[in-house]
Amino acid sequence: MATRNRTLLFRKYRNSLRSVRAPLSSSSLTGTRSGGVGPVIEMASTSLLNPNRSYAPISTEDPGTSSKGAITVGLPPAWVDVSEEISVNIQRARTKMAELGKAHAKALMPSFGDGKEDQHNIESLTQEITFLLKKSEKQLQRLSASGPSEDSNVRKNVQRSLATDLQLLSMELRKKQSTYLKRLRQQKEDGMDLEMNLSRNRYRPEEDDFGDMLNEHQMSKIKKSEEVSVEREKEIQQVVESVNDLAQIMKDLSALVIDQGTIVDRIDYNIENVATTVEDGLKQLQKAERTQRHGGMVKCASVLVILCFIMLLLLILKEIFL
């Protein structure tokens, strides 16, 4: 199903409407000084999205006074601002997603530090992305709960489009977290293998005077590998928690995407019904044409024409022989 993004055009119209101000004429200035009434700005029944849609007028003038010279300005529905905010949150989440991918790559690289700073950065980015996704999900529910009936089709289409974007973003984040989790577990297994090898070597008989120094070096490596394993275990637990949160978000968004597929199926069904109806109408039209050609009225008209022709011949013969 082809779509067109008219967001930039809509924002251009909205900004041009916001920049409109009521002109201060000399008469209005005189009225302000004498009567204490300022310039009047009214909000009347004008809409960018639906010309038949009316909005409640808002005026700064007192009851009973004339609104002559007032400028009428129309505002879009409230759900448009909500959908725009959701789009901004999705864009921010995409930016944070790119930063999270770089942080994952940096954290998985071998380094001499403890990696706490990288882990803190990953945790912060994951929490921010999850917060943006949950916030967008709640706003989507608000978008479906509010709005007039005449704009319901437009609102539902916008809602389904945003829900699809959110679902794709959640799937991408879930994939990144799963990949990061697998690589963390792989590094943990490699560290355990190294620890076992060092433990075996520790109990071998030493043949030179540097055996004690080697054992101390091996013990320090074992302790360091144990600390790394504990840190990796914490990272794995945090990644698992974030994946569970994403699973809940995916569960909530799946209903909206299923509705979109249902509507597409309904459109196909309606198109098939229209094609069947058109074929039936064509058959009825052909039947009516055949009935009109061979009907009783046509036969009567033909008989009358023949009789008129015969009477004309008789009249001519009468004039000739008489």
Curated annotation (Swiss-Prot):
- Kindly provide the name given to this protein in its UniProt entry: Tlg2p-like protein a
* Spans within the Cytoplasmic topological domain: 1-301
Q: Where in the cell is the protein located?
A: Golgi apparatus, trans-Golgi network membrane
Q: Which Pfam families match?
A: SNARE (PF05739)
* Native source species: Arabidopsis thaliana (Mouse-ear cress)
The t-SNARE coiled-coil homology domain, residue ranges:
226-288
Q: Which residues cross the membrane?
A: 302-322
- GO molecular function per UniProt: SNAP receptor activity
Superkingdom of origin organism: Eukaryota
Q: Which GO terms describe its biological process?
A: chloroplast organization; defense response to fungus; Golgi organization; Golgi to plasma membrane protein transport; Golgi to vacuole transport; intracellular protein transport; salicylic acid mediated signaling pathway; trans-Golgi network membrane organization
What is one cellular component GO term in this UniProt entry? trans-Golgi network
- Gene symbol? SYP41
Q: Which keywords does the record carry?
A: Coiled coil, Golgi apparatus, Membrane, Plant defense, Protein transport, Transmembrane, Transmembrane helix, Transport
Report the function annotation for this chain: Contributes to the regulation of secretory and vacuolar transport pathways in the post-Golgi network, and to the maintenance of the Golgi apparatus and trans-Golgi network (TGN) morphologies. Together with VTI12, required for membrane fusion. Vesicle trafficking protein that functions in the secretory pathway and mediates liposome fusion; the fusion of phospholipid vesicles containing SYP41 and VTI12 is triggered by YKT61 and YKT62. Required for extracellular resistance responses to a fungal pathogen. Also involved in the protection of chloroplasts from salicylic acid-dependent biotic stress.
Q: Which family does it belong to?
A: Belongs to the syntaxin family.
Query: PANTHER family from the entry?
Result: SYNTAXIN, SYNTAXIN-16
Q: Where is the signal peptide?
A: none
